[in-house]
């Protein structure tokens, strides 16, 4: 246990931020899962709309420091490529 008041406060803040960050990360993963499910179902329109929403959530998470910007770019790029491949198959 921390002995200084400032350290105790810092620990409380860390725990609070940890819960918030976990929630945000889980929310982003949910949006990514929606995109993946739409791609697997072969529904291009739904996948594109889901990707747009997921991209927004990912960008916000990157701004908050939950994901690095390169990670966000990589995820969006890979999902966009999969959606493009759906178009090519049709």
Curated annotation (Swiss-Prot):
Belongs to the bacterial ribosomal protein bS20 family. SUPFAM superfamilies: Ribosomal protein S20. This is Small ribosomal subunit protein bS20. It comes from Orientia tsutsugamushi (strain Boryong) (Rickettsia tsutsugamushi). GO terms for biological process: translation. InterPro entries: Ribosomal_bS20, Ribosomal_bS20_sf. GO terms for cellular component: small ribosomal subunit. Pfam families: Ribosomal_S20p. The gene is rpsT.
């Amino acid at each position: 246990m921390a002995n200084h008041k400032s350290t105790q406060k810092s620990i409380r803040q860390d725990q609070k931020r940890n819960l918030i960050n976990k929630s945000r990360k889980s929310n982003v993963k949910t949006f990514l899962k929606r995109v993946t499910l739409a791609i697997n179902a072969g529904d291009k329109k739904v996948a594109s709309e889901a990707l747009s929403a997921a991209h927004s959530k990912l960008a916000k998470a990157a701004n908050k420091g939950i994901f690095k910007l390169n990670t966000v770019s990589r995820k969006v790029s890979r999902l966009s490529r999969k959606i493009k491949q759906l178009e090519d198959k049709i």
